[in-house]
């Protein structure tokens, strides 16, 4: 790369340099220059991006009671191998935690054709504000973060998944019956 043309505010400016550093996070500079770009794993499958959103109105005590009565909703590898203390007592005592689970709930909803996302678990992060969680459960499959059409379609699809996930939480997860949408992150997060 010997030069690049940047555009903004109605202007096109050519910049020359001995070295360019691509700070886009997506390899845009290399891709646009025709460089070979590696994407995804050995099968060229990329990790799905997500869109984080925050819910308020969550009753954590009711949620902890549910987990205490249904420990099968925690991942087996967590129960057996990773952390024996990852349970309802941990959630009650910890002001901020990452929850990973609900495999059985999603499987039951999938059998009924009511699972709103194609994934195995729900992920949310308890926030410092009372009754708030940041949800990381959106799933966008067959997505290329370097493709403009995928980015546009992904934004739309992610926003369409939010009300479906909220409905799932309200109708199926104790403690979430009165949850409401507090905020949505500005854009989808592309990991690779």
For each predicted feature, which ranges?
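FAD-binding core of FAD-dependent oxidoreductases
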Residues: 24-25, 46
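Glycine-rich beta-alpha-beta "Rossmann" dinucleotide-binding loop(s) and their flanking helix/strand
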Residues: 11, 31-46
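A conserved short coil-to-beta-strand element within the FAD-binding core of flavoproteins
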Residues: 1-2
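Mobile, glycine/GP-rich and aromatic-enriched active-site lid/loop segments adjacent to catalytic centers
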Residues: 40-192
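Core beta-strand elements of the Rossmann-like FAD/NAD(P) dinucleotide-binding domain
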Residues: 7-19, 23-24
């Amino acid at each position: 790369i010997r030069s690049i043309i940047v555009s903004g505010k109605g202007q096109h400016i050519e910049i020359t340099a001995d070295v360019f550093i691509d700070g886009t996070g997506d390899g845009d500079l290399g891709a646009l220059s025709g460089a070979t770009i590696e994407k995804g794993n050995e099968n060229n499958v990329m990790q799905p991006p997500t869109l984080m959103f925050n819910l308020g109105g969550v009753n954590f005590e009711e949620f902890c009671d549910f987990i205490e009565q249904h420990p099968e909703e925690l991942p087996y590898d967590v129960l057996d191998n990773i952390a024996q203390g990852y349970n309802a007592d941990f959630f009650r005592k910890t002001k901020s935690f990452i929850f990973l689970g609900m495999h059985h709930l999603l499987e039951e909803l999938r059998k009924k054709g009511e699972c709103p996302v194609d994934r195995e678990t729900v992920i949310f992060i308890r926030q410092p504000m009372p009754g708030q969680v940041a949800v990381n459960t959106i799933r966008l499959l067959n997505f290329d973060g370097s493709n403009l059409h995928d980015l546009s379609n992904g934004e739309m699809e992610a926003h369409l998944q939010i009300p479906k996930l909220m409905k799932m939480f309200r109708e199926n997860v104790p403690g979430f019956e009165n949850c409401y949408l507090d905020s949505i992150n500005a854009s989808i997060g592309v990991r690779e």
